[in-house]
């Protein structure tokens, strides 16, 4: 079976000379829940952003569903991007707008302009907004402002917005980095549900190995822009951990969820 995402010899060098990715090659299969781990600056965020071309690679190729993302432009690139949802560390919401409007924005890739979506949302779009907000437990907050929500609730809005794209692939860039441990588990469980129930492939970057072990079906570790480990979460023992994070690193456990915001 052909890979959903195929990355080959991917290099990204920023204008300041930093080589964030140094020849990354990997395949992501459909329905996998892949967790990217590594130190800050190891290339995790850059890799995610190269997959949907929010960052332009310096060289190498990325294909999605057999289409060369690195060569795509115009309408073809827009078609690719609407099939790839993205969840951001800092939520990336329009804080002064309503929760409803933020989630509705996930349909932008299917309409010509934001004005046509905002002024004339279809009945089906409205139904899907409430359906996706219901999935993450905050349909009752639809007409409140996004900035009135807690961090965990704002991230759930981000998940609902990404689901509006009807994606084949969900990219999550440090989605729980600014959340407390219990809320982190709550958000990760929604991503797990999307993966298991909807069959959406998930690639999620995380700081904490304990979360990677709990939710990932596969772990890829980056170090200095290169793949340092690619395998099962259970195969990362203490030796592997120190190879990835350094000899002085100490693993921090994220405790069990109490789901305080559900």
Regions found by a protein language model. Give the residues of each.
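Catalytic Walker B motif of ABC-type/P-loop ATPase nucleotide-binding domains
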Residues: 170-173
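Conserved ABC ATPase "signature" region
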Residues: 67-68, 111, 115-140
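Helix N-cap at the start of a conserved alpha-helix in ABC-type nucleotide-binding domains
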Residues: 181-183
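Conserved ABC ATPase signature
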Residues: 145-149, 153
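Conserved catalytic motifs of ABC-family nucleotide-binding domains
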Residues: 166
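Helix-to-loop junction immediately C-terminal to a conserved catalytic motif
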Residues: 52
């Amino acid at each position: 079976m052909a890979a959903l995402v195929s990355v080959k010899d991917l290099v990204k060098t920023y204008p300041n000379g930093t080589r964030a990715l140094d020849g990354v090659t990997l395949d992501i299969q459909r329905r996998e829940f892949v967790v990217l781990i590594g130190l800050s600056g190891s290339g995790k965020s850059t890799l995610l952003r190269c997959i949907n071309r929010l960052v332009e690679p310096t060289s190498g190729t990325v294909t999605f569903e057999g289409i060369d993302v690195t060569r795509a432009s115009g309408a073809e690139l827009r078609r690719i991007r609407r099939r790839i949802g993205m969840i951001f560390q800092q939520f990336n919401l329009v804080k002064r707008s309503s929760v409803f409007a933020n989630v509705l924005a996930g349909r932008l890739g299917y309409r010509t302009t934001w004005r046509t979506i905002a002024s004339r949302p279809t009945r089906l779009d409205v139904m899907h907004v409430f359906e996706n907000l219901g999935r993450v437990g905050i349909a009752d907050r639809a007409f409140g402002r996004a900035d009135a929500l807690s961090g965990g609730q704002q991230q759930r809005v981000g998940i609902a917005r990404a689901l509006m794209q009807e994606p084949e692939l969900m990219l999550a860039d440090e989605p729980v980095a600014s959340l407390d441990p219990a809320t982190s588990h709550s958000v990760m469980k929604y991503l797990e549900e999307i993966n298991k129930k909807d069959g959406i492939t998930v690639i999620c970057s995380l700081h904490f190995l304990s979360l990677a072990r709990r939710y990932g079906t596969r772990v890829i570790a980056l170090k200095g822009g290169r793949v340092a480990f690619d395998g099962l979460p259970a195969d990362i023992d203490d030796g592997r951990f120190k190879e990835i994070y350094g000899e002085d690193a100490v693993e921090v456990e994220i405790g069990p969820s109490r789901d305080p915001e559900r």
